[in-house]
Amino acid sequence: MKSPTLLALTCSASLAVALFTGCSTSKSVGTGASFKGPIGLQLYSLRGDFAKDVPGTMAKVKDFGIKYVELAGTYNMPPEQFLALLESNQLKAISGHFNFDMYRTNAHAVAHQAEALGLKYAGCAWIPHTGDFDEKEARAAAEVFNNAGKILAEHGIKFFYHTHGYEFQPHGNGTLFDLIMAETDPRLVSYEMDIFWIVHPNQDPVKLLEKYDRRFELMHVKDMKQGTPRNLTGKSDVNNDVQLGTGVMEWPGILAAAKKAGVKWYFIEDEADAAAQHIPGSLKFLEGVKF
Protein backbone atom coordinates (compact mmCIF):
# COMPACT_ATOMS: atom_id res chain seq x y z
CA MET A 1 0.00 0.00 0.00
CA LYS A 2 1.32 3.44 -0.91
CA SER A 3 1.97 6.01 1.78
CA PRO A 4 -0.49 8.92 2.03
CA THR A 5 2.19 11.29 0.71
CA LEU A 6 3.03 9.08 -2.27
CA LEU A 7 -0.66 8.52 -2.98
CA ALA A 8 -1.28 12.26 -2.98
CA LEU A 9 1.65 12.84 -5.33
CA THR A 10 0.43 10.07 -7.64
CA CYS A 11 -3.08 11.53 -7.74
CA SER A 12 -1.74 15.03 -8.37
CA ALA A 13 0.43 13.77 -11.21
CA SER A 14 -2.48 11.86 -12.72
CA LEU A 15 -4.69 14.95 -12.52
CA ALA A 16 -2.01 17.07 -14.16
CA VAL A 17 -1.67 14.57 -17.01
CA ALA A 18 -5.43 14.44 -17.45
CA LEU A 19 -5.69 18.21 -17.55
CA PHE A 20 -2.78 18.50 -19.98
CA THR A 21 -4.24 15.81 -22.20
CA GLY A 22 -7.62 17.51 -22.17
CA CYS A 23 -6.09 20.82 -23.15
CA SER A 24 -3.89 19.33 -25.84
CA THR A 25 -6.75 17.46 -27.53
CA SER A 26 -9.39 20.15 -27.21
CA LYS A 27 -10.92 21.30 -30.49
CA SER A 28 -13.40 23.82 -31.72
CA VAL A 29 -17.03 22.74 -31.86
CA GLY A 30 -18.07 21.69 -35.36
CA THR A 31 -14.63 20.53 -36.47
CA GLY A 32 -13.16 17.04 -36.61
CA ALA A 33 -10.61 14.77 -38.24
CA SER A 34 -11.50 15.91 -41.78
CA PHE A 35 -13.32 19.22 -41.51
CA LYS A 36 -11.10 21.79 -39.83
CA GLY A 37 -13.27 24.87 -40.30
CA PRO A 38 -13.14 27.48 -38.96
CA ILE A 39 -16.90 27.26 -38.53
CA GLY A 40 -19.27 29.97 -37.39
CA LEU A 41 -22.97 30.82 -37.42
CA GLN A 42 -24.82 33.32 -39.60
CA LEU A 43 -26.94 35.04 -36.96
CA TYR A 44 -29.82 35.43 -39.44
CA SER A 45 -30.52 31.79 -38.58
CA LEU A 46 -31.94 33.00 -35.25
CA ARG A 47 -33.54 36.21 -36.53
CA GLY A 48 -36.88 35.48 -34.86
CA ASP A 49 -35.24 34.99 -31.48
CA PHE A 50 -33.04 38.07 -31.90
CA ALA A 51 -36.11 40.18 -32.68
CA LYS A 52 -37.51 39.26 -29.24
CA ASP A 53 -34.39 39.09 -27.06
CA VAL A 54 -30.98 40.13 -28.34
CA PRO A 55 -28.92 39.43 -25.18
CA GLY A 56 -30.65 36.12 -24.50
CA THR A 57 -30.22 34.91 -28.07
CA MET A 58 -26.56 35.92 -28.09
CA ALA A 59 -26.09 33.81 -24.96
CA LYS A 60 -27.77 30.92 -26.79
CA VAL A 61 -25.21 31.24 -29.60
CA LYS A 62 -22.43 31.07 -27.02
CA ASP A 63 -24.04 27.98 -25.48
CA PHE A 64 -23.79 26.19 -28.84
CA GLY A 65 -20.02 26.41 -28.36
CA ILE A 66 -19.65 28.65 -31.39
CA LYS A 67 -16.87 31.24 -31.39
CA TYR A 68 -17.34 32.98 -34.75
CA VAL A 69 -20.39 34.63 -36.28
CA GLU A 70 -21.55 36.39 -39.41
CA LEU A 71 -23.90 39.31 -38.95
CA ALA A 72 -27.12 40.30 -40.69
CA GLY A 73 -27.81 43.59 -38.93
CA THR A 74 -27.47 44.67 -35.31
CA TYR A 75 -31.16 44.65 -34.31
CA ASN A 76 -31.41 48.41 -33.75
CA MET A 77 -28.32 48.48 -31.55
CA PRO A 78 -25.42 50.86 -32.33
CA PRO A 79 -22.44 48.94 -33.74
CA GLU A 80 -20.30 49.65 -30.69
CA GLN A 81 -22.99 48.32 -28.33
CA PHE A 82 -23.53 45.23 -30.46
CA LEU A 83 -19.78 44.60 -30.54
CA ALA A 84 -19.64 44.84 -26.75
CA LEU A 85 -22.43 42.25 -26.50
CA LEU A 86 -20.56 39.93 -28.85
CA GLU A 87 -17.37 40.29 -26.83
CA SER A 88 -19.15 39.66 -23.53
CA ASN A 89 -20.22 36.30 -24.99
CA GLN A 90 -16.73 35.51 -26.31
CA LEU A 91 -17.97 35.80 -29.90
CA LYS A 92 -16.04 37.26 -32.81
CA ALA A 93 -17.84 38.70 -35.85
CA ILE A 94 -15.89 37.83 -39.00
CA SER A 95 -18.24 39.11 -41.66
CA GLY A 96 -21.53 40.89 -42.15
CA HIS A 97 -24.23 41.36 -44.77
CA PHE A 98 -25.38 44.85 -45.74
CA ASN A 99 -28.08 46.08 -48.12
CA PHE A 100 -27.13 46.46 -51.80
CA ASP A 101 -28.42 50.04 -51.90
CA MET A 102 -26.10 50.96 -49.04
CA TYR A 103 -23.14 49.92 -51.18
CA ARG A 104 -24.61 51.69 -54.21
CA THR A 105 -25.29 55.02 -52.49
CA ASN A 106 -22.84 55.22 -49.57
CA ALA A 107 -20.23 52.47 -49.38
CA HIS A 108 -18.23 54.68 -47.01
CA ALA A 109 -21.01 54.33 -44.41
CA VAL A 110 -20.86 50.54 -44.73
CA ALA A 111 -17.10 50.66 -44.29
CA HIS A 112 -17.41 52.68 -41.09
CA GLN A 113 -20.07 50.32 -39.66
CA ALA A 114 -18.04 47.25 -40.58
CA GLU A 115 -14.94 48.79 -39.04
CA ALA A 116 -16.83 49.60 -35.82
CA LEU A 117 -17.93 45.95 -35.63
CA GLY A 118 -14.39 44.66 -36.20
CA LEU A 119 -15.31 42.81 -39.41
CA LYS A 120 -12.83 41.25 -41.82
CA TYR A 121 -15.45 40.99 -44.58
CA ALA A 122 -18.55 42.95 -45.56
CA GLY A 123 -20.87 41.67 -48.25
CA CYS A 124 -24.15 41.70 -50.09
CA ALA A 125 -26.60 38.81 -50.44
CA TRP A 126 -29.25 40.18 -52.81
CA ILE A 127 -29.16 42.32 -55.94
CA PRO A 128 -32.55 44.04 -56.40
CA HIS A 129 -34.15 43.12 -59.71
CA THR A 130 -37.55 42.98 -61.38
CA GLY A 131 -38.58 39.70 -62.98
CA ASP A 132 -35.74 37.52 -64.20
CA PHE A 133 -32.28 38.84 -63.36
CA ASP A 134 -30.73 40.23 -66.56
CA GLU A 135 -27.42 41.29 -68.12
CA LYS A 136 -27.93 45.00 -67.45
CA GLU A 137 -28.52 44.34 -63.75
CA ALA A 138 -25.52 42.01 -63.58
CA ARG A 139 -23.16 44.57 -65.14
CA ALA A 140 -24.48 47.36 -62.92
CA ALA A 141 -24.03 45.18 -59.83
CA ALA A 142 -20.44 44.34 -60.79
CA GLU A 143 -19.69 48.06 -61.01
CA VAL A 144 -21.16 48.62 -57.54
CA PHE A 145 -19.16 45.69 -56.17
CA ASN A 146 -15.86 46.93 -57.57
CA ASN A 147 -16.44 50.39 -56.14
CA ALA A 148 -17.47 48.98 -52.76
CA GLY A 149 -14.44 46.70 -52.76
CA LYS A 150 -12.13 49.64 -53.36
CA ILE A 151 -13.65 51.70 -50.54
CA LEU A 152 -13.72 48.81 -48.06
CA ALA A 153 -10.11 47.93 -48.88
CA GLU A 154 -9.09 51.37 -47.63
CA HIS A 155 -10.34 50.22 -44.22
CA GLY A 156 -8.69 46.79 -44.39
CA ILE A 157 -12.01 45.04 -45.12
CA LYS A 158 -12.76 42.68 -48.04
CA PHE A 159 -16.02 42.96 -49.97
CA PHE A 160 -17.91 39.80 -50.98
CA TYR A 161 -21.01 38.82 -52.90
CA HIS A 162 -23.14 35.96 -51.60
CA THR A 163 -24.69 33.74 -54.28
CA HIS A 164 -28.49 33.53 -54.25
CA GLY A 165 -29.52 31.43 -57.24
CA TYR A 166 -31.14 33.97 -59.58
CA GLU A 167 -27.74 35.00 -61.04
CA PHE A 168 -27.39 31.65 -62.85
CA GLN A 169 -29.65 32.76 -65.71
CA PRO A 170 -28.12 31.61 -69.03
CA HIS A 171 -25.83 34.14 -70.71
CA GLY A 172 -23.70 33.45 -73.78
CA ASN A 173 -21.80 30.21 -73.20
CA GLY A 174 -22.30 30.43 -69.44
CA THR A 175 -24.43 32.29 -66.91
CA LEU A 176 -24.87 35.80 -65.57
CA PHE A 177 -22.87 34.67 -62.55
CA ASP A 178 -19.95 34.02 -64.90
CA LEU A 179 -20.40 37.57 -66.20
CA ILE A 180 -20.31 39.03 -62.67
CA MET A 181 -17.18 37.02 -61.93
CA ALA A 182 -15.53 38.27 -65.12
CA GLU A 183 -16.49 41.89 -64.43
CA THR A 184 -15.28 42.03 -60.81
CA ASP A 185 -11.69 42.60 -59.75
CA PRO A 186 -10.37 39.59 -57.75
CA ARG A 187 -8.23 41.95 -55.70
CA LEU A 188 -11.30 43.84 -54.50
CA VAL A 189 -14.22 41.39 -54.67
CA SER A 190 -14.44 37.94 -53.11
CA TYR A 191 -17.42 35.59 -52.97
CA GLU A 192 -19.43 33.63 -50.46
CA MET A 193 -20.82 30.37 -51.80
CA ASP A 194 -24.17 29.46 -50.28
CA ILE A 195 -24.45 25.75 -51.06
CA PHE A 196 -28.25 25.78 -51.00
CA TRP A 197 -28.36 28.64 -53.51
CA ILE A 198 -25.95 26.86 -55.83
CA VAL A 199 -27.86 23.58 -55.89
CA HIS A 200 -31.30 25.26 -56.00
CA PRO A 201 -30.70 26.55 -59.58
CA ASN A 202 -29.25 23.14 -60.53
CA GLN A 203 -25.59 24.16 -60.41
CA ASP A 204 -22.74 21.96 -59.17
CA PRO A 205 -20.86 23.49 -56.21
CA VAL A 206 -17.78 21.30 -56.73
CA LYS A 207 -17.42 22.31 -60.38
CA LEU A 208 -17.97 25.96 -59.50
CA LEU A 209 -15.29 25.84 -56.80
CA GLU A 210 -12.90 24.25 -59.28
CA LYS A 211 -13.73 26.80 -61.97
CA TYR A 212 -13.26 29.80 -59.68
CA ASP A 213 -10.35 28.66 -57.56
CA ARG A 214 -9.46 31.19 -54.79
CA ARG A 215 -12.46 33.44 -55.55
CA PHE A 216 -14.73 31.95 -52.87
CA GLU A 217 -13.30 32.95 -49.49
CA LEU A 218 -16.46 32.28 -47.48
CA MET A 219 -19.12 29.57 -47.53
CA HIS A 220 -22.60 29.00 -46.14
CA VAL A 221 -23.03 25.33 -45.28
CA LYS A 222 -26.74 24.75 -45.70
CA ASP A 223 -28.59 21.54 -46.53
CA MET A 224 -31.71 21.09 -48.65
CA LYS A 225 -34.73 18.91 -47.95
CA GLN A 226 -35.30 16.01 -50.32
CA GLY A 227 -37.79 16.93 -53.04
CA THR A 228 -37.31 20.70 -52.83
CA PRO A 229 -38.38 22.33 -56.13
CA ARG A 230 -35.45 23.91 -57.99
CA ASN A 231 -35.49 27.03 -60.15
CA LEU A 232 -33.80 30.36 -60.89
CA THR A 233 -35.91 32.59 -58.65
CA GLY A 234 -33.53 32.72 -55.70
CA LYS A 235 -36.51 31.99 -53.47
CA SER A 236 -37.60 28.90 -51.54
CA ASP A 237 -39.66 28.02 -48.48
CA VAL A 238 -37.39 28.53 -45.46
CA ASN A 239 -38.38 25.12 -44.14
CA ASN A 240 -36.63 23.51 -47.09
CA ASP A 241 -33.50 24.15 -45.01
CA VAL A 242 -32.70 21.04 -42.95
CA GLN A 243 -30.06 19.89 -40.49
CA LEU A 244 -26.70 19.24 -42.15
CA GLY A 245 -26.33 15.65 -43.29
CA THR A 246 -30.07 14.99 -43.54
CA GLY A 247 -30.68 16.54 -46.96
CA VAL A 248 -29.50 16.19 -50.54
CA MET A 249 -26.03 17.72 -50.33
CA GLU A 250 -22.94 15.57 -50.96
CA TRP A 251 -20.92 17.11 -48.15
CA PRO A 252 -17.68 15.10 -48.36
CA GLY A 253 -17.08 16.16 -51.96
CA ILE A 254 -18.20 19.74 -51.37
CA LEU A 255 -16.04 20.27 -48.29
CA ALA A 256 -13.00 18.64 -49.90
CA ALA A 257 -13.38 20.92 -52.94
CA ALA A 258 -13.87 23.97 -50.70
CA LYS A 259 -10.65 23.25 -48.85
CA LYS A 260 -8.75 22.81 -52.11
CA ALA A 261 -10.26 26.00 -53.58
CA GLY A 262 -9.12 28.12 -50.64
CA VAL A 263 -12.32 28.77 -48.69
CA LYS A 264 -11.23 30.51 -45.50
CA TRP A 265 -14.43 30.74 -43.42
CA TYR A 266 -17.52 28.55 -43.11
CA PHE A 267 -20.84 29.56 -41.58
CA ILE A 268 -23.90 27.48 -40.81
CA GLU A 269 -26.95 29.31 -42.09
CA ASP A 270 -30.28 27.64 -41.38
CA GLU A 271 -33.35 29.72 -42.17
CA ALA A 272 -35.88 27.09 -41.04
CA ASP A 273 -38.30 27.70 -38.19
CA ALA A 274 -36.53 24.90 -36.30
CA ALA A 275 -33.02 26.29 -36.85
CA ALA A 276 -32.22 26.42 -33.13
CA GLN A 277 -33.01 22.71 -32.89
CA HIS A 278 -30.99 21.90 -36.03
CA ILE A 279 -27.77 23.74 -35.14
CA PRO A 280 -26.36 21.32 -32.52
CA GLY A 281 -26.92 18.38 -34.88
CA SER A 282 -25.36 20.28 -37.77
CA LEU A 283 -22.25 20.99 -35.70
CA LYS A 284 -22.09 17.32 -34.72
CA PHE A 285 -22.35 16.30 -38.36
CA LEU A 286 -19.39 18.50 -39.31
CA GLU A 287 -17.36 16.96 -36.51
CA GLY A 288 -17.88 13.49 -37.96
CA VAL A 289 -17.95 14.05 -41.72
CA LYS A 290 -15.10 12.27 -43.53
CA PHE A 291 -13.40 13.28 -46.77
Model-assigned labels for residue ranges:
Residues 154-248:
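Acidic/histidine-rich catalytic cores of soluble enzymes
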Residues 2, 24-121, 214, 284, ...:
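N-terminal pre-domain/capping segments
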Residues 1-11:
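Bacterial N-terminal signal peptides that target proteins for export
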Residues 37-42, 69-71, 93-98, 122-124, ...:
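Hydrophobic faces of well-ordered beta-strands that scaffold small-molecule active sites
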Residues 68, 75, 100-191, 276:
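Active-site acidic/histidine proton-transfer and metal-coordination neighborhood
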Residues 19-22:
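C-terminal motif of bacterial Sec signal peptides marking the signal peptidase cleavage site
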Residues 257, 272-291:
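Aromatic-rich peripheral "rim/lid" segments of glycoside hydrolase catalytic domains that contact
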Residues 44-46, 72-74, 98-101, 127-129, ...:
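Active-site beta-loop-alpha junctions enriched in small/polar residues
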